[in-house]
Amino acid sequence: MFKMIFLILSLYSYANANSYKDMFEKDIEIKKVDKIYASTPTILYSLYAIDKSKIAGLNFPFNKVEAIYIDETIKSLPIIGGWFGKGNTPNSEMILKINPDVILLSETSKNQSEKRIRDSLGNINIPFFYIKANSIEDIINSFSYLGKLTSNEKRAKELENYAKKVLDEAKELSKKVKEKPRVYYAQGNNGLETECDKSIRSELITLASGDNVHKCQNSNTYGKELINFEKVLSYNPEIILVYEKEFYKKVYSDPKWQFIDAVKNKKVYFLPKGPFSWFDRPPSFMKILGLKWLLNILHSNSYEIDINKDAKEFYSLFLGLELSNIELNHIMGKDIE
């Protein structure tokens, strides 16, 4: 009965709707855009940067690292879940309860089955707006769509211009790089989970003109390819990028890792995170800053920047945060070096 009443009211409310185009150039009719449900973390974070006042609910509770930097009003929003990761689905009753004006869905959701998603919601007439957010370029391009949807086109353009400038700098530098440094992306508490060079999860290595040593096609969409130490030793990377603090804390003291050039030469780097990772898991607009950071690490002679200054400017622009040196050091893992 509740779903039937909701459907009747929804049909009535869209009689005088405004027209928008999603990232697949599909026309979407929406009467108003006051409450938006973003069904994946990547899209949610971009919406947060452009207009957090429109967020209607969260995909999951923010963890301790994230919560420090997130607006209090957002942290108190209902947890709805979403369509992302390893088969996650949202609470459909909660979606009906918050009654969003539009649902933002990922390219992955579109590929899997719009009908299945509609069926799970009882075929209610909430508009679906599809966002491409797999790559850093997708994320940057999504800003203009989110800007128009939220009537914040000026802010969206400002963020887009900043991001495209960083991407252009990376592309220009790539033309001058003669030899790409060998890079290993270490995940897991033992550092023996990684990503293939073809994976979108390691795209910053490629964009920063690095050579991801693990050449393969991912065996699944989630990633985290298992690898043994002997394989890492055979790769002998010049640079190691570390996701977990647990591994970063012990890599320099673990005897077997001392045979690898990156460890010998103190070229192991913790991947900054706060509120979200600068590199991946989950991917977000923070990768824009991560690209600047990685360019500076891999090509410090040709890409000279003050990363502390640039990071503070980025946090101020994208998140409205004025970071202290102590906060930035914590984000960048300098407190565990």
Where are these regions (language model features)?
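Bacterial Sec-exported substrate-binding components of ABC uptake systems
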Residues: 14-46, 153-186, 297, 302-337
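A short, structured surface patch at a secondary-structure boundary
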Residues: 43-97, 102-109, 210-213
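Extracytoplasmic ligand-binding site segments that recognize negatively charged/polar headgroups
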Residues: 65-66, 86-87, 107-116, 131-145, ...
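Structured C-terminal subdomain patch of bacterial secreted/periplasmic proteins
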Residues: 135-148, 248-337
